[in-house]
């Protein structure tokens, strides 16, 4: 298999060669069956929107799109400010995304770009040493992410040939104030991936086939550092990966219309020399697979089943072991489900089971900043029921209930429920579609009591109390305008669902939030 850095170096040339292999004139692919261009006139459309909410929150967004003769262009920008309920805190977010696509008779090609910037500022917590200062210091955090991708797709008979090149850059800087002084941390990462694909549609003895084979060649690097009194350090890591994937979907047709999907993925991850195990090689192997099947037993009744194994590799971002990567996470899941009904009334039920090994989580209880770590083996078994019924022409009622038993498995703490995982979630929502562009919905969500974290040994007798919240929304359309009034936690119910300690480190979420917005379409 081709080395990853070399493959990524020639990726741009590959895209250019694929693009040059297509006709340069887009009008051939932009014509309909009668030879008339599909869009002889350019169509420019978009929308502008603004929202105001309690807590000093306000946001604006604008979007534009243009379509003509097989060419599509789109761009959007948004900005959000939020003061939250904490005095002196400020959150500022700006975003942009755009893209272009050209469709031809022989294929299509295009690109996308997006950028997100976030700035957070809030006063440092009260402490005795702060009284000696003329002004309280502030905790500052900045996060930026940039993504870009380009793709080319070519149609050759019943085959689709495609290649995509993607890049993502992340940047994070933080300044924290403490009793021993301030601490600074920084993070820079760059991720590149080249993904060639071959897809084929066909028939085999009356069975429809959809086959896809592909490669993912990935290169990732990260630089991080910390600066504090007497504790300075920097770290740099690189990681290359190559993956082979295969997907096959079979459609048998007939009365019950059986469908079967098979997916396989094998990935090799090349570790940084500093992360190699003492008695191992520099490559780590991971495998994933997916099997799904469905039957249409009756016009209104369908059943399905699926089983899968997946994995997740730590990005070596922020661990307590000196920036050393964690053990890869493994997930095994099975699910059975059935759906019955039509547009008037419907119901579905699914039974699921999930087993996790070396689950990668962010533990807020480790130090002031928290660290990423692996959990012991665990499992989650449950059932979910959803139903929908049209009460009248303009009224609809939806409801769902989810029951989950989450516990540690094959572990010294085998038996206790996993902290901060609710056993029962239930919700009911009523929808109304009125005349002259008016609509509304009202919902109630209920969460059953859950255990505090990090109570691994079941020593905390208290539980996070159960709570119910109410939210609603009213929308009115007036020509090109759309006005909306929405609210969450309308009953102003005091509740919280994030408590990393036993009756401590509680993050309240008990404020009624009202929002009003206006959107103009053109």
Question: What is the role of each PLM region?
Answer:
Residues 2, 26-27, 31, 449-453, ...:
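C-terminal beta-signal and adjacent terminal beta-strands/loops
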Residues 160-176, 219-222, 260, 296, ...:
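Membrane-embedded beta-barrel scaffold of Gram-negative outer-membrane proteins
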Residues 54-81, 86-120, 138-160, 200-205, ...:
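Transmembrane beta-barrel wall of Gram-negative outer-membrane proteins
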Residues 260, 353, 374-455, 491, ...:
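Gram-negative outer-membrane beta-barrel transporters
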Residues 204-212, 216-218, 232-356, 390, ...:
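Structural signature of Gram-negative outer-membrane beta-barrels, strongest in the C-terminal barrel
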Residues 50-54, 68-70, 79-83, 92, ...:
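Transmembrane beta-strands of outer-membrane beta-barrel pores
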Residues 82-83, 87-89, 108-155, 161, ...:
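Flexible loop and strand-edge segments within Gram-negative outer membrane beta-barrel domains
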Residues 70-74, 106-111, 157-161, 204-211, ...:
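Repeated loop/turn-to-beta-strand initiation elements of outer-membrane beta-barrel proteins
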